[in-house]
Structures are given as structure tokens and as C-alpha cells.
Amino acid sequence: MRCLCSWLCLLLPLSACFPLLDRRGPTDIGDIGARMSWVQLTEGHTPRSVQSPRPQALLVVAKEQQASRREHTGFRLGRQDSGSEATGFLPTDSEKASGPLGTLAEELSSYSRRKGGFSFRFGR
């Protein structure tokens, strides 16, 4: 009885490695079950895999993902060579601080002109 149990313990992981070819139909990927037999699998013959993606297709997918990320980030812009990055965000003499940029700054980053600048709120 002990010998039977040890054989079952050895064969159980082995059965997990090999798919049940006779029970699977033509729904297998690449129809491996119809083309390969147990003898060929045990001899080390590997079934031909489905055609791997081409490198050009992978580049196209990567570029599409980058483009979709740019759409989701809103108005994040790349670097601009002319001037400092912060000059576009500071109000000029002719522009009031209560313009659309000022109200947006108040709403998003708790900027308050009454308090005299930025205030950091912890816990929110």
C-alpha cells in the first residue's frame, strides 16, 4: 500500500505536465492535440508554436500605448526650449492673479491668495 501511494505521488505531478490530448478538440491553440501524439511529446519533440509576433507589430503596439497615455494625462506638455519652465505659470503684470490659471491653482493645489501663498493640508 505504501508503494502504491508513492507511485501516485510521483505520477500526479507528471500528469500535470502533459495535457490530455485525447479529450481536447480542435479548440487547442494551433490544434496541437490533433497533430502531436504522446510518443512524440515524450521523445522531446516540441509542437510548433503559433507564429510569434513580428518586431514591427510590437513597436506599433508600444507607440499606440504611449499615445493613449498622452491622451489620458491631460495638458501635460513636453519640455520647451525657450525660457524657463515656470515662466508660463507665473502671472505677468497685465494678467490678474484671479484669472483662470489662478482659480485653477486654488482649486487643485490649495493655493490661497488670502493666506499669502501655498498652504499644505495633511490628511486629505
From Swiss-Prot:
UniProt keyword DNA damage, yes or no: no
Residues with PTM Pyrrolidone carboxylic acid: 80
UniProt KW Signal keyword: yes
InterPro entries from the UniProt entry: P518 (IPR024565)
Tissue distribution of the protein: Expressed in the brain with highest expression levels in the hypothalamus and optic nerve. Also expressed in the trachea and mammary gland.
UniProt keyword terms in alphabetical order: Amidation, Neuropeptide, Pyrrolidone carboxylic acid, Secreted, Signal
Location(s) in or outside the cell: Secreted
One GO biological process term: grooming behavior
Signal peptide: 1-17
Disulfide pattern: none
Record GO terms (molecular function): G protein-coupled receptor binding; neuropeptide hormone activity; orexigenic neuropeptide QRFP receptor binding
Residue ranges of the propeptide: 18-79
Positions where Phenylalanine amide occurs in the chain: 122
GO cellular component: extracellular region
Region (Disordered): 63-100
Predominant cellular place of this UniProt entry's protein: secreted
Free-text function comment from the UniProt entry: Stimulates feeding and grooming behavior, metabolic rate and locomotor activity and increases blood pressure. May have orexigenic activity. May promote aldosterone secretion by the adrenal gland.
Entry's family note: Belongs to the RFamide neuropeptide family.
Quaternary structure note: Ligand for the G-protein coupled receptor QRFPR/GPR103.
Name used for this protein in its record: Orexigenic neuropeptide QRFP
